[in-house]
């Protein structure tokens, strides 16, 4: 697919545009009830961007280039890029609002089950067990923290995102996903605290779950090739 590299780069730019527009449209803390999705797209064409707004663009273009160079079948390549766009959109929303909307997490979960049922990188049984275990593990952590500390350590959106990751990657990958997510979250908290010189009380965990799941999904695709 290297001959199609310019086309894939263009796809990366287009994907970034829609990732940001959908993230804005679905962001729960924004009052956009009077805006249609088309008006949101117009808003993003006219918006002036800060330097940090280029991060999703860089990631989208990098992911598109990786897909162009990957030796996978078109179905697997398309599925990987679709998963990436979903979790990137969720990460943008979570960083901004610390919320993960059901309108993205639940379709992502069902898409994972359907993909593995038809073209799967893993057995459908492993995908179903992964979805159940992904939700259940963080549900237990949530209530464990609540009983001990009397406060919420996680959000319900994190449960659903890990369930979706389990549906795509299987239950066997959940420990590694959680390890990567935990290390990423801890590292981010430490760096943020050093740079801002104040105590960080909460962080968005969704982006780190997204990172861990994307790494594991890419690895599964590679060993299945």
Swiss-Prot record:
Please give the residue ranges for the topological domain Cytoplasmic: 24-67, 125-127, 196-202
Instruction: Write the Enzyme Commission number(s) for this entry.
Output: 3.4.23.43, 2.1.1.-
Question: Its induction, per UniProt?
Answer: Silenced by the DNA-binding protein H-NS under standard growth conditions.
Location in the cell: Cell inner membrane
Q: What is its main location?
A: membrane
This enzyme catalyses:
Typically cleaves a -Gly-|-Phe- bond to release an N-terminal, basic peptide of 5-8 residues from type IV prepilin, and then N-methylates the new N-terminal amino group, the methyl donor being S-adenosyl-L-methionine
Q: Which keywords belong to this entry?
A: Cell inner membrane, Cell membrane, Hydrolase, Membrane, Protease, S-adenosyl-L-methionine, Transferase, Transmembrane, Transmembrane helix, Transport
Where in the chain are disulfide-linked cysteines found? none
**One cellular component term from this protein's GO annotations in UniProt:** plasma membrane
Pfam families (alphabetical): Peptidase_A24
List the Periplasmic topological domains: 1-2, 89-103, 149-174, 224-225
A Gene Ontology biological process noted in the UniProt record is: signal peptide processing
Q: What is the topology of this protein in the membrane according to its UniProt annotation?
A: Multi-pass membrane protein
The record lists the membrane-crossing segments as: 3-23, 68-88, 104-124, 128-148, 175-195, 203-223
Q: Recorded GO terms, molecular function? A: aspartic-type endopeptidase activity; peptidase activity; transferase activity
Q: Remarks, anything else?
A: Part of a cryptic operon that encodes proteins involved in type II secretion machinery in other organisms, but is probably not expressed under laboratory conditions. However, GspO is functional when expressed from a stronger promoter.
Family label: Belongs to the peptidase A24 family.
The record describes the protein's role as: Plays a role in type II pseudopili formation by proteolytically removing the leader sequence from substrate proteins and subsequently monomethylating the alpha-amino group of the newly exposed N-terminal phenylalanine. Substrates include proteins required for biogenesis of the type II general secretory apparatus.
- The entry's protein name is Prepilin leader peptidase/N-methyltransferase
User: What lineage is on file?
Assistant: Bacteria, Pseudomonadati, Pseudomonadota, Gammaproteobacteria, Enterobacterales
């Amino acid at each position: 697919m290297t001959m199609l590299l310019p086309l894939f780069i263009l796809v990366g730019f287009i994907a970034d545009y829609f990732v940001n527009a959908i993230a804005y449209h679905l962001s729960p803390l924004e009052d956009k009830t009077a805006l249609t999705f088309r008006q949101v797209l117009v808003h993003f064409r006219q918006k002036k961007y800060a330097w940090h707004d280029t991060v999703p663009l860089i990631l989208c273009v990098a992911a598109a280039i990786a897909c162009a160079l990957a030796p996978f079948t078109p179905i697997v390549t398309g599925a990987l890029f679709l998963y990436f766009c979903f979790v990137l959109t969720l990460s943008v929303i979570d960083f901004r609002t610390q919320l993960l909307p059901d309108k993205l997490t639940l379709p992502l979960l069902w898409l994972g089950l359907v993909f593995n049922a038809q073209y799967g990188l893993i057995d459908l049984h492993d995908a179903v067990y992964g979805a159940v275990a992904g939700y259940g593990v963080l549900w237990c952590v949530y209530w464990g923290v609540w009983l001990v500390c009397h406060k919420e350590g996680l959000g319900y959106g994190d449960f659903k995102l890990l369930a979706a990751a389990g549906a795509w990657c299987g239950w066997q990958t959940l420990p590694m996903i959680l390890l990567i997510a935990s290390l990423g979250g801890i590292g981010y908290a430490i760096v943020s605290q050093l740079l801002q010189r104040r105590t960080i009380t909460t962080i968005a965990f969704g982006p780190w779950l997204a990172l861990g799941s994307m790494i594991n999904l890419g690895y599964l695709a590679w060993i299945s090739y």
